[in-house]
Amino acid sequence: MAAQDQASPQTSRKEAAPALAKAQAALTHGDSQGAIRILSDHLQIQPGDSSARLMLGQAYALAGQIDLAESELQNVLKMAPENFVALAALGEIYEQTGQPEKAEAMLARAAKAGHDQPEIRLEWAIVLARLHRYKESQSALAGLAPPADSGKRIAFYRLKASVASGLGNSVTAASEMEKALALKPQDPALLLATAAAQLQRKNWQRAGELANVVFTQTRDPSAGLLVLEATLGSHGDVHQLLEQLRNTAVPQAEEVAFRQRLAELLIANGHVSESIDELKRAAELAPARADLLFDLSLAQFKAGQLDGALNSAEKSKALTDSAEVEDLIGDIQEERGDNLMAVQSYQAAVKLAPEEEKYRISLAVELMQHQGFDAAKVVLQQAEESQPRSWRIQLALGMVEYFTGSDATASSILIHAADLAPDPEVALTFLGDIQMSQTSVPDSAAVDHICRYSDDHPQNGKMQLNCGALLFEQDYVAGNRTHVDEIVKRLREAAEILASDPAPHCELAKVYRSMDRWHEALPEAERCARMDVNSAEAHYRLAQIYRRLGSLEKSQQEMKLYEGASRRQADENTRRDETMKAFVYTIRREAQSSKQ
């Protein structure tokens, strides 16, 4: 029995060799069914022959009998778990059948078991890239030499470009695409792909040259769009190119997408008015698409075509009402001066999307703009109940309090908004403005927050200014001069950063004057008055300094300027109106970003 057992493997291999050779010959000639018959017959006699079973799995795969192929390959792995050929073949099957996660797992095992066989590592890298696992794909490709075959080499460079692009390395991506293009320099697909890579790199000239080769030869609309993007990126004249694109023949099934993309490129580069005709054409071609009408309305609104914008928005609403379109209609009605209709639209937006802060903020801001502060406060308090940790809602609540004269309450709420915000700068900016405008002693918690932020962001001139100025106000009232050096340092840094802003110089003049350092106060006060000729306070302060230093004639001249500026001086309501404008712009921008 032992002798038979010892002879058996040798006999099996001898018997298997002719069967495997015949099956391989059949596969070589494309006869996968013939190979399947030969191998199946052989495995009836030798069911444990893993080589035959592996070949059978491959034959099934070539014949398109995927389930049978997977079954046979799994049987091979039961017998030989580290058979890298079977692992790779299974990985390829999973990839072809849309199961990239399973494919990746098999190819990872195959690469390890096959001692980093180049072909397997390359296939593994491809699957990793398709899974957007670019760092791992880059590692799989590391050290691999480009294939000798030209077609495979092009695919290799394109893969490396894709991985580099996925990692945000546009320079390397463009370089790899240029290598691929060099192997087939007249290929339209490679020209366009390389142009797209150069666009990502912002190499506008090279991108335009490559795409224009294809566009000139073929009038391919996609090539034309790449030329347009490159021209817009380089701030070139697009009028002639736009005319060519508008006259380009586009397949009917692709025209809507073409017009939409053309409009998107124009809008993204500030050519809003030019985008309107493209969006109109797209909306005509697809009249049932509410999104196209919405985009058209938004472009018309930005271009100041308010009647057209309202008409397009109403058509979009008739197709599909949404909070987004109601919010846009509210913006349009506000711009048209119909605040009652604007309020109704904003209320409709809130009703359609009660959990989205953007629409509640839009409604509250509309009410605030027309002095409906109590109503705005109710809207924001309702929003606060559902979203207590929304810093934007807290910012708006704080500003409502400020606009109604409750500066202390406003500051407290804005401090809370700053604590909630991922970046507190917006809330702290308004907090600083409120504190700077007060005649009372600055709030110590507010000053602490502003100064901490300025310490963490030393290049933020506005925060350095506010911190220095507020520290001075605190110390001046308390008769404390221990922070003078810090205050002066902050204000000088602010003056350097905010080169065109008179405020740091005005504040420095106040500090030096309070310390009787008149000769140092003078140049700062002169700069302050020269840079802000309408500031009554600046002229009055400079007049006092001139008098103190004995320049009576100059003092009298400054007093005359002070009297004229006093008559023109903005009152508290005007200052609040200016703050309102800044707030409305900021909060709408922030609310919009929260929805994106």
Residue locations for each model-derived region?
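Helix-start (N-cap) detector for alpha-helical repeat units in TPR-like alpha-solenoids
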Residues: A16, S50-S51, F84-V85, P118-E119, ...
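Residue-level recognition of tetratricopeptide repeat
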Residues: Q24, Q58, E92, I126, ...
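Register position in tetratricopeptide repeats
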Residues: T28-H29, L62-A63, Q96-T97, R130-L131, ...
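Canonical positions in the second alpha-helix
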Residues: D41-H42, N75-V76, R109-A110, G143-P146, ...
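Structural marker of alpha-solenoid helical repeat scaffolds
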Residues: I45, M79, A113-G114, P147-D149, ...
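Canonical tetratricopeptide repeat
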Residues: M55, A89, E123, L159, ...
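TPR/TPR-like (Sel1-like) alpha-helical repeat modules
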Residues: A129, F215-R219, D419, R530, ...
